[in-house]
From Swiss-Prot:
<feature type="region of interest" description="GPS">
    <location>
        <begin position="711"/>
        <end position="757"/>
    </location>
</feature>
<dbReference type="InterPro" id="IPR007110">
    <property type="entry name" value="Ig-like_dom"/>
</dbReference>
<dbReference type="Pfam" id="PF01825">
    <property type="entry name" value="GPS"/>
</dbReference>
<keyword id="KW-0807">Transducer</keyword>
<keyword id="KW-0472">Membrane</keyword>
<feature type="glycosylation site" description="N-linked (GlcNAc...) asparagine">
    <location>
        <position position="84"/>
    </location>
</feature>
<feature type="transmembrane region" description="Helical; Name=6">
    <location>
        <begin position="1017"/>
        <end position="1037"/>
    </location>
</feature>
<feature type="glycosylation site" description="N-linked (GlcNAc...) asparagine">
    <location>
        <position position="162"/>
    </location>
</feature>
<dbReference type="GO" id="GO:0043542">
    <property type="term" value="P:endothelial cell migration"/>
</dbReference>
<feature type="region of interest" description="Disordered">
    <location>
        <begin position="1084"/>
        <end position="1310"/>
    </location>
</feature>
<dbReference type="GO" id="GO:0043231">
    <property type="term" value="C:intracellular membrane-bounded organelle"/>
</dbReference>
<feature type="repeat" description="LRR 2">
    <location>
        <begin position="109"/>
        <end position="130"/>
    </location>
</feature>
<dbReference type="InterPro" id="IPR001611">
    <property type="entry name" value="Leu-rich_rpt"/>
</dbReference>
<feature type="domain" description="LRRCT">
    <location>
        <begin position="190"/>
        <end position="241"/>
    </location>
</feature>
<dbReference type="GO" id="GO:0050920">
    <property type="term" value="P:regulation of chemotaxis"/>
</dbReference>
<dbReference type="GO" id="GO:0090210">
    <property type="term" value="P:regulation of establishment of blood-brain barrier"/>
</dbReference>
<feature type="glycosylation site" description="N-linked (GlcNAc...) asparagine">
    <location>
        <position position="691"/>
    </location>
</feature>
Length: 1336
């Protein structure tokens, strides 16, 4: 550039080389590396470093950057080997273990030192001397545990410090005092404990403008975990609560099984929190010290890196004594914590404890076979849906049980497990809850709700926990007066608990004594000048308390009474306590009350002046009660004193936890001395009462019978018990005892009891006397009916289905009544009472279901419609099994009872005076099922009645024949309606009297005696009588005296009416039953064997009966003598006989299946047949009908021809040649009836064979051949159609009779017996000559 300011142009190529100039200088041979960077340091690189604040230009040759990272340096490099101008020294990711004093002396220009990610554990004081220009120091991710103020000496200009990731848990105060320029620090670690030891740091940081890094997070305690230290307040940094150590372990940590003579070392390490941290060793709770002779070597505590403390214990020669728990305990000023390990020392011959199952209130535990000396563990049963978040039920808790050296199980420890009973778990929750004045009343009301069901308590801990809560509430009575009433109610409810549970609770925790003691102290705690009187009433406890002045006291008489039961105005006082039932929630008028008057009036328990009330106990306190005050307690002005009275209905709460007579049954088998009267208490508080100059007079009413009465007072010293010292009996009557006592306290009369004391109307009390004879009559009638129908099964004309239903119904009604009378009051025995409740539950439901099933079957029969049978159509389906009825009427109650008992067997014992379901479970297990069964049954009754009514409306002429008297059968036009088909489509005669009117009988076996209307009326009567009996019986055991008597009488009426009706209807009024009874009696004379014959329904091939003469006796003479029978009293035409045959057609062959719906309505006439119980065999024979049809048809044609021939007297046929029923085709069972079958039914005339009649009661020739029991072929049907039509037009025919066995001709009866030889030879019957008679 010249003087004129000219500028030389720069070539473009030079401009491109300017940016590359620094790189070229570094790559030049003379400039690579910095001069003075020594070669001997392996892994170190040196480079120039641009000063901060310079954006361009060359590096300052005096500033050096040395990088020695990622190598294996065991210590920092010698500063003498580093360049003098080293500004940055990076030593990260090496293996440096410590920093010695003056490790960096000489690097005075060093500004940044990076020592992160090494294994530095010690930093000696003065390690950073000579680094006066150092501004950034990084010691993170090392193993530094000790940091003091000397550690950072020589760093006056340090601005940023990072010591995070080390192993220290706290910082000592003043550790940063040598860093005056420090602005940012990061010291977060995984062990950092933010407690009172770091409280100094927050104000120090504020005063020195120190910024704590946001990455400095607390690790302990757990409440401050992951919280930034900079965001905490000083008040949050405190050393309170449980001690939490970041490190605490014991080696070995698991149970060790060793042998005698082995060597076993222990090592315990924990966090070191300061000079007060110590480690101690314990064996089975006993402190251990070093003892070389015993083989115990205990080393001194060692401290590592100011962070850990370690102690070692060595057992050099293990003996049996070393078995048990070894404990390492860490003690600090803040608290103690410990770790345990179990050691089991085995002997040379070790035994085993056997496998065992233990069931208790904590669950079901199965302990396996365990080696002797070993402690076994079982996981507790957890309840994931429980609402009790208790530490004892936390997941992972276990029960433990030790097997001792002898191979015997020790008692287990189940305290960490939850209770299995819901009520016990809830009561345990109440015990754990903190109580204060703000929530005491609320908790008391909630607890009272649970004690209302105290009668169902099943665990002694229920009583223990309630007693503990009552004692806790006592401390708040002076602030909350309402607690008095709640506490008395809870104590009253607990008196309903089972006596054995009360005794167990007393033995476990003196629970009963605690309850009584709390009640005795209520008056002194609750009374004040503002509340000078308290009166509380409850079912079993009454309390009265007064605040009185001793100088104005003139005596006090108090009487405990209760309202007389409704309707017992004339009852004797002795009945009180015996008739009143134990009720969990009694009525208000049955509560105990006090009535007190001043002075000493003469009050008698027998003549209590309050209307409709009964006095139970009275006490008279003498006027000199306070005259014996000690001089120290007699100030010039007499103080106020508390006088309190209590009365307990019985002595249930007075239990001794010792082994004396207070335990049930301890005095001998069946007898013991127990409390036989109420217990009354009188006591003072706030003023001392010395020896009484006058005794206290007490009168008590007996509620239990016994002998040898004794006056006693309750002594709470020691185990507690009744003592007669100071009390004497004045007199004792059967109902009332009077006594004197020199003590203030609980007083009662003890007696030798013949049974355990029980509450009024208690367990085991009998029913009203009228119940027993009426129930006996009912059982006699029911079992007579059952036995009759079982022994005469084949001779009673009822269907198979009806037979099963009747027997089951009678049996279950008998079971209900018998169990009710015999066991409903047996509440003394828990298992028996539960069995009675289950049986009553089952039998009651089953009886109702059998009635419903019977109503359904009757409705099906009435609504049955006959199916139209086309030619070639298959026969109706076979009978359905009876098992379905048993599954409904017996299976459903069994399932309900099984589920109810499986859920909780105590659902069948409510501590009520009767054995039945608890109220709440009974709603779903009994009353709801009954509410479903009854409407369904009544609907079936209604539908059946409507079908009967519609039939009467459609057939007004037969309306008066629907409901018949017993033994009466439908005849006339009713027979015409059911006489449509005489023979079925397998080849039998289809003799149709009136086409379009006749329909076949329904495929159900009906009653051969009663019409459907009569059956329906009988079933409804039985149903409602049973309901009335059940309801009256239930009221008879649950009501009070007068309603109980009324209901007992009504029960007796209903039971007697039910039994008599069932027996009369099903046995006494049936001719077939009466005939079977007469058959059981021997004949009075030889002539008694000749019984008049009657027309019997004999089965055809298709199961339809026709009228024929029944055998007079099965013992008729086998000879073939001819005789003439006397003429019958009336004559019947063949048409009438045919009509009678069809009307009484049997439906046994149709089976027992349910009726199928069809298009036409069936006949309502009763269907009479000879042996309805063989219908299954007849039904099976249908399958062979086609194979034997031809043979059967030919035999019938022969019979027709022979019947018209005068030379064929052996065959019976009509004059027109029609064949009603061949003898060979009659059902074989028709000849096997009892003699009673030969009698005519009630209301039915005796019939004899008409001309052309082929009916016979003789057995067929070949009863075993199915071909002989088949219908005629359809060819035979065509051949005999015209003859049948002519026969139907006849009005009457003469009936020829024959005398058998020499009987005079023209007699009134005939003997139609045929010998078996004749039946086998000819298969026909003998008959007389035909007589002609005018025909219209």
């Amino acid at each position: 550039m010249g003087a004129g300011g000219r500028r030389m142009p720069v070539p473009p190529a030079r401009l491109l080389l300017l940016p590359l100039l620094p790189c070229l200088l570094l790559l030049a041979p003379g400039t690579r590396g910095a001069p003075g960077c020594p070669v001997p340091i392996r892994g170190c690189k040196c480079s120039g470093e641009r000063p901060k604040g310079l954006s361009g230009g060359a590096h300052n040759p005096a500033r050096r950057r040395v990088v020695c990272g990622g190598g294996d340096l065991p210590e920092p490099p010698d500063p003498g080997l580093l360049p003098n101008g080293t500004i940055t020294l990076l030593l990260s990711n090496n293996k440096i273990t410590g920093l010695r004093n003056g490790s960096f002396l000489g690097l005075s220009l060093l500004e940044k030192l990076d020592l992160r990610s090494n294994v530095i554990s010690t930093v000696q004081p003065g390690a950073f001397l000579g680094l006066g220009e150092l501004k950034r120091l990084d010691l993170s991710n090392n193993r530094i545990g000790c940091l003091t103020s000397e550690t950072f000496q020589g760093l006056p200009r340090l601005l940023r410090l990072n010591i995070s990731g080390n192993i220290y848990s706290s910082l000592q105060p003043g550790v940063f005092d040598e860093l005056p320029a420090l602005k940012i620090v990061d010291f977060g670690t995984e062990f950092l404990t933010c407690d009172c030891r770091l409280r100094w740091l927050l104000p120090w940081a504020r005063n020195h403008s120190l910024q704590l890094s946001e990455r400095t997070l607390c690790a302990y305690p757990s409440a401050l975990h992951a919280h930034a230290l900079s965001s905490l307040q000083e008040s949050q940094l405190r050393c309170e609560g449980a001690l939490e150590l970041h490190t605490h372990y014991l080696i070995p940590s698991l149970r060790q099984v060793v042998f005698q003579g082995d060597r076993l070392p222990f090592q315990c390490s924990a966090s070191y929190l300061g000079n007060d941290t110590r480690i101690h060793w314990y064996h089975n709770g006993a402190p251990m010290e070093s003892d070389e002779q015993a083989g115990i070597v205990l080393a001194e505590n060692l401290i590592h890196d100011c962070t850990f403390i370690t102690s070692e214990l060595t057992l050099s020669h293990i003996g049996v004594w070393a078995s048990g728990e070894w404990e390492c305990s860490v003690s600090t000023v803040q608290g103690n914590t410990s770790k345990k390990v179990e050691i089991v020392v085995l002997e040379t011959s070790a035994s085993y404890c056997p496998a065992e199952r233990v069931t208790n209130n904590r669950g079901d535990f199965r302990w396996p076979r365990t080696l002797a000396g070993i402690t076994a563990y079982q996981s507790c049963l957890q309840y994931p849906f429980t609402s009790v978040p208790l530490s004892g039920g936390a997941p992972g808790t276990r029960a433990s049980r030790r097997c001792d050296r002898a191979g015997r199980w020790e008692p287990g420890d189940y305290s960490h497990c939850l209770y299995t009973n819901d009520i016990t778990r809830v009561l345990y929750t109440f015990v754990l809850m903190p109580i204060n004045a703000s929530n005491a009343l609320t908790l008391a009301h909630q607890l009272r709700v649970y004690t209302a069901e105290a009668a169902s308590f099943s665990d002694m801990m229920d009583v223990v926990y309630v007693a503990q809560m009552i004692q806790k509430f006592l401390g708040y009575v002076d602030q909350i007066k309402e607690l008095v009433e709640v506490m008395v109610d809870m104590a009253s409810n607990l008196m309903l608990v089972d006596e054995h549970l009360l005794w167990l609770a007393q033995r476990e925790d003196k629970a009963c004594s605690g309850i009584v003691g709390a009640l005795e102290r209520i008056g002194g705690a609750a009374l004040s000048p503002h509340a000078q009187h308290i009166s509380v009433n409850s079912r079993n406890v009454a309390l009265e308390a007064y605040l009185i002045k001793p100088h104005s006291y003139v005596g006090l008489t108090c009487t405990a009474f209760q309202r007389r039961e409704v309707g017992v105005s004339g009852a004797q006082p002795s009945s009180v306590g015996q008739d009143a039932p134990v009720e969990p929630e009694p009525l208000a008028d049955q509560q105990l009350r006090f009535r007190c008057t001043t002075g000493r009036p003469n009050i008698s328990l027998s003549s209590f002046h309050i209307k409709n009330s009964v006095a139970l106990a009275s006490i008279q306190l003498p006027p000199s009660l306070f005259s014996t005050l000690p001089a120290a307690l007699a100030p010039p002005v007499p103080p106020d004193c508390t006088l309190q009275l209590l009365v307990f209905r019985n002595g249930r709460l007075f239990r001794s936890h010792g082994n004396n007579t207070s335990r049930p049954g301890a005095a001998g088998p069946g007898k013991r001395r127990g409390v036989a009267t109420p217990v009354i208490f009188a006591g003072t508080s706030g003023c001392g009462v010395g020896n009484l100059t006058e005794p206290v007079a007490v009168s008590l009413r007996h509620w239990a019978e016994g002998a040898d009465p004794m006056a006693a007072w309750w002594n709470q010293d020691g185990p507690g018990g009744w003592s007669s010292e100071g009390c004497r009996l004045r007199y004792s009557q059967p109902n009332v005892s009077s006594l004197y006592c020199q003590h203030l306290g609980n007083v009662a009369v003890l007696m030798e009891l013949n049974a355990f004391p029980r509450e009024a109307g208690g367990s085991g009390a009998g029913l009203h006397p009228v119940v027993y004879p009426c129930t006996a009559l009912l059982l006699l009638c029911l079992f007579s009916t059952i036995i009759t129908y079982i022994l005469n099964h084949s001779s009673i004309h009822v269907s198979r289905k009806g037979w099963h239903m009747l027997l089951n119904l009678c049996f279950h009604m008998a079971m209900t009544s018998a169990v009710f009378v015999g066991g409903v009051t047996l509440t003394n025995y828990q298992m028996v009472c539960q069995a009675v409740g289950i049986t009553l539950h089952y039998s009651s439901l089953s009886s109702l279901l059998w009635m419903g099933v019977k109503a359904r079957v009757l409705h099906k029969e009435l609504s049955w419609r006959a199916p139209p049978l086309e030619e070639g159509e298959a026969a109706p389906p076979g009978p359905r099994p009876m098992l379905r009825f048993y599954l409904i009427a017996g299976g459903i109650p069994l399932i309900i009872c099984g589920i109810t008992a499986a859920v909780n067997i105590h659902n069948y014992r409510d501590h009520s005076p009767y054995c039945w379901l608890v109220w709440r479970p009974s709603l779903g297990a009994f009353y709801i099922p009954v509410a479903l069964i009854l409407p369904i049954t009544w609907i079936y009754f209604l539908c059946a009645g409507l079908h009967l009514r519609s039939h009467v409306a459609q057939n007004p002429k037969q309306g008066n024949r629907i409901s018949l008297e017993p033994g009466e059968e439908l005849r006339g036009s009713t027979r015409l309606r059911s006489s449509g088909v005489l023979l079925n489509d397998s080849g039998s005669l289809l003799a149709t009297v009136s086409a379009g009117v006749g329909t076949p009988a329904p495929p159900e076996d009906g009653d051969g005696v009663y019409s459907p209307g009569v059956q329906l009326g009988a079933l409804m009567t039985t149903h409602f009588l049973y309901l009335a009996m059940w309801a009256c019986g239930a009221l008879a055991v649950s009501q009070r005296w007068l309603p109980r008597v009324v209901c007992s009488c009504l029960y007796g009426v209903a039971a007697s009416a039910l039994g008599l009706f069932v027996f009369t209807h099903h046995c006494a009024r049936r001719r077939d039953v009466r005939a079977s009874w007469r058959a059981c009696c021997p004949p009075a004379s030889p002539s008694a064997s000749h019984v008049p014959a009657r027309a019997l329904p004999t089965a055809t091939e298709d199961g339809s009966p026709v009228l024929g003469e029944g055998p007079a006796s099965l013992k008729s003479s086998p000879s073939g003598s001819s005789g003439r029978a006397p003429p019958p009293p009336c004559k019947l035409t063949n048409l009438q006989v045919a009509q009678s045959q069809v009307c009484e057609a049997s439906v046994a062959a149709r089976g027992d299946g349910e009726p199928e719906p069809t298009g036409s309505r069936g006949s309502l006439a009763p269907r009479h047949h000879n042996n309805l119980h063989h219908g299954r065999r007849v039904h099976k024979s249908r399958a062979k009908g086609h194979r034997a049809g031809e043979t059967g048809g030919k035999s019938r044609l022969k019979a027709l021809r022979a019947g018209t021939s005068p030379g064929a007297p052996e065959l019976l046929s009509s004059e027109s040649g029609s064949l009603h029923n061949s003898p060979s085709d009659s059902y074989p069972g028709s000849s096997r009836n009892s003699p009673g079958d030969g009698l005519p039914l009630e209301g039915e005339p005796m019939l004899t064979p008409s001309e052309g009649s082929d009916t016979s009661a003789a057995p067929i020739a070949e009863t075993g051949r199915p071909g002989q029991r088949r219908s005629a072929s359809r060819d035979n049907l065509k051949g005999s159609g015209s003859a049948l039509e002519r026969e139907s037009k006849r009005r009457s025919y003469p009936l020829n009779t024959t005398s058998l066995n020499g009987a005079p001709k023209g007699g009134k009866y005939e003997d139609a017996s045929v010998t078996g030889a004749e039946a086998i030879a000819g298969g026909s019957m003998k008959t007389g000559l035909w007589k002609s008679e005018t025909t219209v």
